[in-house]
């Protein structure tokens, strides 16, 4: 019976591990118990988690580790077994994790020396071959203070009391929930570190990146997309599709190309699909650690596709924006003219402040004094009994623009610019509900306004009368011109008719219309519609028949035998 440190240890060789392991092993938890061992005469159970490293691949892995209870630090660079004491029981340690592990309550009553669990929680008892490589167990701690450098006995004793999770560093790509297991290993229990370095940094994953000054000035970021890890260089970052800032397998990719390589080509936002330290790159952008460029940036970084050395231009940083809804845009456009109209009323009201400051509660119930005066004088009769309605009064700039276009250019027009502001109306707003506000208006001012309106209407009446007279004169002149043209045309037609009647050929044809209509065509024997214009004797139905019969008819057509062959034949229709 031998008792060591009030606890017993079970050492398993490589053959026993190969008999119980699986070909895809992600985690190894070595449980030590005192129920089935021949050295079990101790009074306290001390559970230990062993970190097993390979002698072939991890020669520079764990250079030294310290034990909290034994106080001994090992410097073995080769493969070995390092015992890390844990003060918490194994049940609370396993149940507090987020990995796929089996709690001790689910184990059979007899002792299980080793439990092999992969990421899918699949248990295997078959014998598989592991080769010469063993996996590494990582103990993640929530430290109250950042872990320091190389391992010592005192640091180990203070940092091993907060172990609550068990992770795995399988191939450097990360565990199930966090890809940065190397950083987690630096904060492991006991402050264990390698030969050439020490683990530093924050231990809690809930702290922001802005709180860590090393992240703010970091040039290379270890990023991950799904299960693929790569390096992102801050100085080469452009936008999603421009700027080859991701180095993966000695090749440079843009963030979008890296997503496609990782199988996330259908992703819509590269800033959220690419992770760093368990967080998306969007969190780094929000905190100002990374600053992407705009999509239309023309700097050297964004134009490094083929000839990036010769490209130059300003750096346009990406500025997020929020689109306005269509309803808000419509409301803004509709409210614009309303504000302008209110401004116009306010300008008119400023000239009559003595009448507008009487009440503020009934501002909506207002009446226009000018409209009331116009209603009272709806019709005005001048000296020529001409009625004028309010609709005849138009704007002061060009009241008779439509009539000016129809007048003759020789007509004398009235210069409207010399009339001044005769059509400008003054507006007085009176509250209907308040009777005292109506009495405030001065009688002289009211009479002055009525006189002004009357003068304006009389002026418009005179202008309308003048324009009407000018239009009548222009109309009469045009009627005279048209009458003269009609008389000249009638006289010309009479002269032409008398000349046609005196012509014997035309008179003979007029008297012989009935005879021609009874004749037949000399060529086709159809009803004749015309006759030869040379001899006025041979009828034809068309020009075609006349041309066809001309060789035989030219002998008979002897009106002028000397010029028979030179005459131009014309067909005269009997209906003309």
From Swiss-Prot:
It is found in: Nucleus. Keywords: DNA-binding, Metal-binding, Nucleus, Transcription, Transcription regulation, Zinc, Zinc-finger. The keyword Oxidoreductase does not apply. A zinc finger (MYND-type) spans 521-557. Residues 61-76, 191-207 have a biased composition (Gly residues). Gene3D superfamilies: 6.10.140.2220, SAND domain-like. A motif (Nuclear localization signal) lies at residues 324-340. Transcription factor that binds the homeotic Deformed (Dfd) response element. High affinity binding sites contain at least 1 TTCG motif surrounded by additional TCG sequences. May be involved in the selective action of Dfd on these sites without binding directly to the Dfd protein. Requirement of DEAF1 activity may be a common feature of enhancers targeted by Dfd. This is Deformed epidermal autoregulatory factor 1. It comes from Drosophila melanogaster.
């Amino acid at each position: 019976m031998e008792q060591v440190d009030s606890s017993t240890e079970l050492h398993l060789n490589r053959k026993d591990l190969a008999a119980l392991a699986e070909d895809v092993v992600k985690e190894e938890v070595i449980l030590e118990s005192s129920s089935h061992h021949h050295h079990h005469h101790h009074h306290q159970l001390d559970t230990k988690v062993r970190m097993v490293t390979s002698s072939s691949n991890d020669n520079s892995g764990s250079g030294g580790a310290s034990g909290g209870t034994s106080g001994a630090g090992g410097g073995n660079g080769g493969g070995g077994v390092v015992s890390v004491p844990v003060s918490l029981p194994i049940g609370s340690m396993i149940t507090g994790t987020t990995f796929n592990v089996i709690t001790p309550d689910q184990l059979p009553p007899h002792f299980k020396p080793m439990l092999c669990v992969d990421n899918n929680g699949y248990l295997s008892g078959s014998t598989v071959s592991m080769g010469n490589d063993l996996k590494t167990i990582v103990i993640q701690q929530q430290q109250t203070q950042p872990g320091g450098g190389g391992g010592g006995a005192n640091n180990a004793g203070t940092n091993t009391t907060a172990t609550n999770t068990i992770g795995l560093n399988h191939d450097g790509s990360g565990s199930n929930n966090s890809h940065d297991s190397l950083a987690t290993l630096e904060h492991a229990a006991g402050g264990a570190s390698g030969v050439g370095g020490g683990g530093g940094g924050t231990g809690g994953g809930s702290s922001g990146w802005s709180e860590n000054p090393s992240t703010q000035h970091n040039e290379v970021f270890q990023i991950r997309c799904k299960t693929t890890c790569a390096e992102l260089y801050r100085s080469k970052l452009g936008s999603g599709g421009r700027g080859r800032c991701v180095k993966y397998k000695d090749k440079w990719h843009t963030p979008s190309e890296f997503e496609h390589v990782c199988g996330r080509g259908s992703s819509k936002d590269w800033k959220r699909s690419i992770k760093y330290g368990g967080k998306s790159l969007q969190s780094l952008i929000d905190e100002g650690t990374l600053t992407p460029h705009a999509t239309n940036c023309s700097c050297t970084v964004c134009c490094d596709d083929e000839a990036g050395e010769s490209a130059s231009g300003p750096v346009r940083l990406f500025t997020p924006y929020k689109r306005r809804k269509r309803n808000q845009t419509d409301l803004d456009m509709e409210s614009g003219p309303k504000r302008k109209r209110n401004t116009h009323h306010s300008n008119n009201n400023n000239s009559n402040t003595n009448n507008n400051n009487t009440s503020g509660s009934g501002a909506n119930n207002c009446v226009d004094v000018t409209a009331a005066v116009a209603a009272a004088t709806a019709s005005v009769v001048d000296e020529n009994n001409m009625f004028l309605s309010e609709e005849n009064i138009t704007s002061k700039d060009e009241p008779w623009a439509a009539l000016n276009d129809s007048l003759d250019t020789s007509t004398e027009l009235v210069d409207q610019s010399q009339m001044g502001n005769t059509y400008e109306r003054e507006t007085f707003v009176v509250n209907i509900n308040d009777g005292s506000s109506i009495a405030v208006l001065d009688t002289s001012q009211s009479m002055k306004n009525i006189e002004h309106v009357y003068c304006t209407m009389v002026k418009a009446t005179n202008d309308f009368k003048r324009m009407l007279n000018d239009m009548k004169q222009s109309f009469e002149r045009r009627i005279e011109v048209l009458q003269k043209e009609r008389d000249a045309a009638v006289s010309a037609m009479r002269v032409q008719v008398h000349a046609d009647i005196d012509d014997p050929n035309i008179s003979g044809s007029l008297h012989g219309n009935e005879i021609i209509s009874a004749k037949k065509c000399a060529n086709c024997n159809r009803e004749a519609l015309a006759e030869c214009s040379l001899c006025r004797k041979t009828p034809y139905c068309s020009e075609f028949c006349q041309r066809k019969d001309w060789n035989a008819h030219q002998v008979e057509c002897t009106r002028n035998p000397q010029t028979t062959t030179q005459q131009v034949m014309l067909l005269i229709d009997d209906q003309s």
